[in-house]
Curated annotation (Swiss-Prot):
GO terms for molecular function: ATP binding; proton-transporting ATP synthase activity, rotational mechanism. InterPro entries: ATP_synth_F1_ATPase_gsu, ATP_synth_F1_gsu, ATP_synth_F1_gsu_CS. The keyword Repeat does not apply. It comes from the Bacteria. Keywords: ATP synthesis, Cell inner membrane, Cell membrane, CF(1), Hydrogen ion transport, Ion transport, Membrane, Transport. This is ATP synthase gamma chain. It is a peripheral membrane protein. F-type ATPases have 2 components, CF(1) - the catalytic core - and CF(0) - the membrane proton channel. CF(1) has five subunits: alpha(3), beta(3), gamma(1), delta(1), epsilon(1). CF(0) has three main subunits: a, b and c. Produces ATP from ADP in the presence of a proton gradient across the membrane. The gamma chain is believed to be important in regulating ATPase activity and the flow of protons through the CF(0) complex. Belongs to the ATPase gamma chain family. NCBIfam families: ATPsyn_F1gamma. One of its GO terms (biological process) is proton motive force-driven plasma membrane ATP synthesis.
Amino acid sequence: MASLKSIKKRIVSVKNTRQITKAMKMVSAAKLRRAQENVVAARPYAKKLGEVLDRLAKSQDGSSSPLLQKRISQKALLVVVTSDRGLCGGFNANICKAAERFIREKKAEFAEISVTTVGRKGFEFLKNRQKIHKNYGNVLSNLSYPTAALLAQEVVEGYVAEEYDEVYLLFNAFRSVMSQDITLQQLLPIVPEETAEEEYVPEYIYEPSKGELLDELLPKHIEVQVFKALLESVASEHGARMTAMDSASKNATEMIGKLTLQYNRARQAAITTELMEIISGAESIKG
């Protein structure tokens, strides 16, 4: 049986760890509220912009925009969004596994698949497994639209220059504190959504012209989609970390209870042994 001193030391250590996990849970909860508000605000704008683009693209048959043109797919770019920090359960591991699965399943379809990572954890996992086109580190802790726009612009420039023929975005979409959905989204070429034949599509008058608006809005659409995906990932990260730290705190409390019971039993055994020795000594003196 472990000594009283070692058990007491473990109890103190676990209590200190519980204090840290509780503090991290509270910090994540505060950050989650702000991140969730940002996601809720971004979703309607991204959706409406997508709807406007769908109408424009469908009414502009044979558009000259390279962002709408499908070409022979030989090279693909996968943008993988993870976090810069750990201690968030399976948040990063699940995305990295999904990235590996995508690469494995698409190998026959593409001659070359490159990966751009957003977040240090994804880069560390994939750097020795796959060709890394570029890594964006330490951008999620203080995420801003200009940062997301820069990433999107670089992706668009590479696509227009035919460095890759298709671009996919892999990220955790926020659903709730307990739930995040791994989402794979085709970013380029932009594919308008299918509209049911019976669905009424109103006609709009566009100025200066549909073509000019389309050329202006398509890059903006990519920027918005990237920004929304990063916001979703940040909210998912905080939700996953909050859940993980809550679970760790509960496990620590349970362990403290078991160690305390073990300590009390060891202490009781030590007292009993000491009493037996005293009684034995007294008996030997009498004898």
